Amino acid sequence: MTNIRKTNPLLKIINSSFVDLPAPSSLSSWWNFGSLLGVCLGVQILTGLFLAIHYTSDTATAFNSVTHICRDVNYGWLLRYLHANGASMFFICLYLHVGRGLYYGSYTYSETWNIGILLLFAVMATAFMGYVLP
């Protein structure tokens, strides 16, 4: 008796895409962190842009603009929450992504590894200049 997911034309498409995916057997949940980094970065950029629309950098009114965002802007509190916690999630995913590369020996591909290290240093420098120094 054949399996219905392999004989039905509609289920066959879904089966070949999701169930019997042609992927290596060494794929594990550790390999999701690259795409999670992309999602976190996208959320950071979008929430940062929307927060920057309402933020005032003048020293006399900066705190008032933050309270304005939280109280008067629709879901402004959520934007601020997502932006603050998204940065932490981004760095957690980044360090786990590098840790996965160390565990699986990706450092042997020196060109790719060196580009990744340069990106890591650039992200850390940007976070330091943008969030720690001001």
Curated annotation (Swiss-Prot):
Subcellular location as annotated: Mitochondrion inner membrane
Chief place where the protein resides: mitochondrion
Keywords: Electron transport, Heme, Iron, Membrane, Metal-binding, Mitochondrion, Mitochondrion inner membrane, Respiratory chain, Transmembrane, Transmembrane helix, Transport, Ubiquinone
Transmembrane regions listed in the UniProt entry: 33-53, 77-98, 113-133
4Fe-4S found in the keyword field: no
GO molecular function, one term: metal ion binding
Amino-acid positions noted as binding heme b b562 in the UniProt annotation, renumbered to this chain: H83
Names of required cofactors: heme b
UniProt keyword annotation of Iron-sulfur present: no
Pfam families from the UniProt entry: Cytochrome_B
Binding site for heme b b566: H97
Any one Gene Ontology BP term: mitochondrial electron transport, ubiquinol to cytochrome c
PROSITE patterns: CYTB_NTER
Topology of this chain in the membrane: Multi-pass membrane protein
Gene Ontology cellular-component annotations: mitochondrial inner membrane
Co-factor binding details: Binds 2 heme b groups non-covalently.
Miscellaneous section: Heme 1 (or BL or b562) is low-potential and absorbs at about 562 nm, and heme 2 (or BH or b566) is high-potential and absorbs at about 566 nm.
Family: Belongs to the cytochrome b family.
Subunit description: The cytochrome bc1 complex contains 11 subunits: 3 respiratory subunits (MT-CYB, CYC1 and UQCRFS1), 2 core proteins (UQCRC1 and UQCRC2) and 6 low-molecular weight proteins (UQCRH/QCR6, UQCRB/QCR7, UQCRQ/QCR8, UQCR10/QCR9, UQCR11/QCR10 and a cleavage product of UQCRFS1). This cytochrome bc1 complex then forms a dimer.
Function noted in UniProt: Component of the ubiquinol-cytochrome c reductase complex (complex III or cytochrome b-c1 complex) that is part of the mitochondrial respiratory chain. The b-c1 complex mediates electron transfer from ubiquinol to cytochrome c. Contributes to the generation of a proton gradient across the mitochondrial membrane that is then used for ATP synthesis.
Name by which UniProt lists this protein: Cytochrome b
Gene encoding the protein: MT-CYB
